Swiss-Prot record:
Keywords: Ribonucleoprotein, Ribosomal protein
Pfam families the UniProt entry points to: Ribosomal_S9 (PF00380)
Any single Gene Ontology cellular-component annotation: cytosolic small ribosomal subunit
GO-annotated molecular function: RNA binding; structural constituent of ribosome
InterPro entries in UniProt: Ribosomal_Su5_D2-typ_SF, Ribosomal_uS9, Ribosomal_uS9_bac/plastid, Ribosomal_uS9_CS, Ribsml_uS5_D2-typ_fold_subgr
Biological process according to GO: translation
Organism for this UniProt entry: Hydrogenovibrio crunogenus (strain DSM 25203 / XCL-2)
Family stated for the protein in its record: Belongs to the universal ribosomal protein uS9 family.
This protein's name: Small ribosomal subunit protein uS9
């Protein structure tokens, strides 16, 4: 008997997360490792749990996540986005709650490119009067 699963894709910066929700006890694995082992920073774990806590589903689902690209903060944001989308697939009533908290909106901010003649994206070379 196959248990029903709900899928959501999340993106943030250069990270892409594929999230699968299955009915369970609240176990979360990222790339085959436990979530607390994969994301060591407390802030990243808080970010990941936001959608589940907002919809009061923290201990109702086992979450399996595959995430690639970017750094830890971008990956945590991508996972949050993916979980939010999967919760909407699970129950459309979650959409308004998640939308109010801004969890369904893709964060479009990316690293600005370096420009020719500048040291970084906006940092100009030091000006010398003489």
């Amino acid at each position: 008997m196959a248990t029903e699963q709900y899928y959501g894709t999340g993106r943030r910066k250069n990270s892409v997360a594929r999230v699968f929700l299955r009915a369970g006890s609240g176990k979360m694995t990222v790339n085959g490792r436990d979530v607390t082992e994969y994301f060591a920073r407390e802030t990243d774990l808080m970010v990941i749990n936001q959608p589940l806590e907002a919809t009061e589903n923290a201990d109702k689902f086992d979450v399996t996540i595959t995430v690639t690209g970017g750094g830890t903060t971008g990956q945590a944001g991508a996972v949050r986005h993916g979980i939010s989308r999967a919760l909407v697939v699970f129950n459309e009533d979650n959409r308004s709650t998640l939308r109010q908290r801004g969890l369904l909106t893709r964060d479009a901010r990316k690293v600005e490119r370096k420009k020719v003649g500048l040291r970084k994206a906006r940092r100009r070379p030091q000006f010398s009067k003489r």
